[in-house]
């Protein structure tokens, strides 16, 4: 027995440096299925919706998948739908901590003189960022847009430069902004496709904006200024979460509408509708088509525990394995039963491992086609066995051997 113990101890001491300092490399990248704004070729444009608007698009918010199009790249005047980008930049400035909701924003002479829809700000009048956002989202206040642009960037011109830079970053290749509010100006144009892109960025990554865009009626200035939402779908369409209307004599009637039912969030954009009513009818047709024909399956949730596994040379019995991010799969209704998952672990997984270190991947398939994936991570730091761990095992082994 003593000889066996001495032999095992010698092996432990010889191998211990290797155990302590072993280094393993893992790939960070994973295959993605939802390349934003990628056409879902199997199901888009299968029906004719007979839309009255000149241009339109229906997009799944979660994946960016396009579900229906009509002249989606036609460059048209956006009118106040321009404000989707203005609102996006405001929300991003809030996220970065550059401004706060309670900050007071002054109205300049230029902002006061803005025409079109407004709340009639007086020069030097101060409203909070929260109040400005409410006025922009609910009644499309041009004066508040200019005041916010000056507050964030120093001038509307500088702010518009940021709008165009952000549009380029988002891949909005049909777009050129000339102002922050959407009043007609030669060359100020975009497309239904690009509006869907920026609407998705705003709605998906800044869901707090829905607290403003779903307001039907409210007030400012201690109740003296009544606000009624220009987007009638907020009141009359089940699940509507926003987003922005726009109209001028040249642009006619535009709308970017967002809605959510169950786990499916949709973006419907219509441009150059002949009348206000027809734009809302067209958006309703698009949304109805989407909700009737598609579903979004949450296959894997972020940080979901998939299983517990043993790790070679680990000082603990088992380790929880979690997912890195959500995996949502958009599919035609009835196809949910054809979704399956497959877990693949990296080769030679050994301790030590850092907390949330990647050790594998979970692939998600729809009709045997890879459509989604996320990394598998360890849910704790995993240390290598040390000499004391081996000694403890040795003692247990020796005890069992001697019985």
Identify the role of each PLM range:
Residues 1-4:
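Positively charged n-region of N-terminal signal peptides that target proteins for export
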Residues 9, 13-17:
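Hydrophobic core
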Residues 9, 42-44, 254:
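A generic local structural motif
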Residues 11-12, 69, 92, 255:
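Hydrophobic alpha-helical membrane-insertion segments
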Residues 14-15, 95, 294:
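Hydrophobic alpha-helical membrane context
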Residues 21-206:
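Active-site-adjacent loops and short helices of periplasmic peptidoglycan-processing enzymes
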Residues 172-176, 184-403:
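Domain-terminus/edge residues, biased toward the C-terminal soluble/receptor-binding domains
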């Amino acid at each position: 027995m003593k000889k066996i113990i001495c032999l095992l101890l010698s092996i432990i001491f010889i191998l211990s440096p290797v155990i302590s300092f072993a280094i393993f490399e893992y790939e960070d990248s994973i295959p993605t299925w939802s390349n934003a704004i990628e056409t879902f070729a199997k199901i888009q444009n299968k029906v004719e919706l007979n839309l009255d608007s000149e241009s339109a698009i229906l997009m799944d918010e979660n994946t960016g998948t396009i579900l229906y199009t009509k002249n989606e790249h036609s460059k048209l005047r956006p009118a106040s739908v321009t404000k989707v980008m203005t609102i996006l930049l405001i929300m991003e400035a809030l996220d970065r901590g550059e401004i706060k909701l309670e900050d007071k924003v002054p109205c300049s002479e230029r902002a006061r003189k803005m025409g079109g829809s407004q709340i009639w700000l007086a020069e030097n009048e101060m409203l909070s960022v929260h109040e400005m956002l409410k006025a922009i989202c609910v009644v499309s206040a041009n004066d508040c847009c200019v005041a916010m642009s000056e507050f964030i960037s120093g001038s509307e011109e500088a702010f518009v430069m940021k709008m165009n830079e952000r549009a380029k970053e988002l891949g909005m290749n049909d777009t050129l902004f000339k102002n922050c509010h959407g009043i007609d100006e030669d060359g100020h144009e975009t497309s239904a496709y690009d509006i869907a892109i920026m609407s998705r960025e705003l709605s998906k990554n800044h869901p707090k904006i829905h607290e403003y865009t779903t307001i039907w009626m409210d007030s400012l200035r201690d109740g003296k200024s009544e606000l009624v939402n220009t987007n009638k779908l907020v009141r009359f369409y089940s699940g509507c979460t926003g987003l922005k209307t726009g109209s001028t004599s040249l642009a006619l009637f535009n709308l970017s509408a967002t809605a959510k039912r169950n786990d499916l969030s949709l973006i419907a954009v219509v441009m150059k509708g002949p009348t206000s009513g027809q734009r809302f009818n067209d958006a309703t047709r698009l949304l109805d088509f989407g909700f009737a024909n598609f579903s979004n399956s949450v296959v894997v949730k972020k940080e979901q525990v998939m299983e517990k596994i043993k790790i070679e040379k680990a000082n603990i019995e088992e380790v929880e394995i979690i997912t890195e991010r959500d995996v949502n799969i958009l599919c035609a209704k009835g196809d949910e039963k054809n979704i399956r998952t497959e877990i693949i672990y990296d080769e030679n997984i050994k301790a030590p491992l850092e907390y949330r270190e990647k050790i594998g991947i979970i692939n998600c398939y729809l009709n045997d086609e890879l459509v989604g994936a996320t990394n598998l991570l360890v849910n704790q730091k995993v240390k290598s066995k040390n000499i004391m761990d081996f000694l403890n095992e040795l003692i247990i082994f020796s005890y069992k051997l001697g019985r």
